[in-house]
């Protein structure tokens, strides 16, 4: 995980705990983390000296790049699926279209039946049917073909599910 550059900064562990607590409490924007920041019970529950503001979360998440995301989430997924009580998993693989409005990184014109000619993303997703958990997710540009790069996606997914017997559906 990215470290803090300042000795006044918050630890990565605190930022993750506080951010996840905010999400569990309904936050869906960085600014919403200010609500849990003011909650004394949450601060005492976690044993934090002080609570981080929304700008701290933005700076923390901006330190991640594709390589560090891959490293962190592969380890997180491996830990999760290793502790899962299922040894035989059914993997559902799908792709979909997300129409984008405005200018979003990676959005391109491609096949879009609902909004032809609009910018979109065309992600690949894999789900474990038994526990309704996302096993892998790759965000691709809108001009990607449905099966484009599926072999590498499945290799990455199987790496995250190491030690489990997987059936595809």
Describe the residue ranges of each PLM region.
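Short, hydrophobic/amphipathic alpha-helical patches that form generic packing surfaces
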Residues: 14-26
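DNA-recognition alpha helix
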Residues: 30-45
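Active-site-proximal, Lys/Arg-enriched surface segment
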Residues: 56-125
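Electropositive, glycine- and tryptophan-enriched low-complexity nucleic-acid-binding patches
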Residues: 113-165
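Short acidic, glycine/serine/threonine-rich loops at helix termini
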Residues: 45-46, 101-107, 135-139
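Short, conserved catalytic/metal-binding motifs centered on acidic residues
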Residues: 18-19, 33, 53, 57, ...
């Amino acid at each position: 995980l990215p470290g803090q550059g300042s000795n006044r900064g918050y630890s990565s562990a605190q930022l993750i705990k506080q951010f996840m607590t905010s999400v569990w409490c309904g936050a869906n924007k960085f600014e919403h983390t200010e609500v849990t920041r003011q909650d004394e019970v949450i601060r005492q529950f976690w044993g934090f000296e002080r609570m981080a503001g929304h700008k701290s979360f933005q700076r923390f998440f901006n330190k991640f790049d594709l390589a560090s995301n891959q490293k962190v989430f592969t380890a997180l997924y491996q830990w999760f699926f290793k502790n899962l009580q299922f040894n035989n998993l059914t993997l559902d693989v799908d792709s979909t279209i997300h129409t984008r409005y405005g200018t979003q990184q990676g959005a391109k014109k491609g096949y879009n039946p609902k909004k032809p000619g609009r910018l979109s993303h065309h992600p690949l997703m894999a789900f474990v049917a038994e526990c309704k958990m996302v096993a892998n997710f790759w965000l691709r540009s809108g001009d990607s073909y449905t099966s484009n790069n599926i072999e590498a996606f499945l290799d990455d997914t199987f790496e995250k599910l190491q030690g489990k017997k997987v059936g595809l559906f």
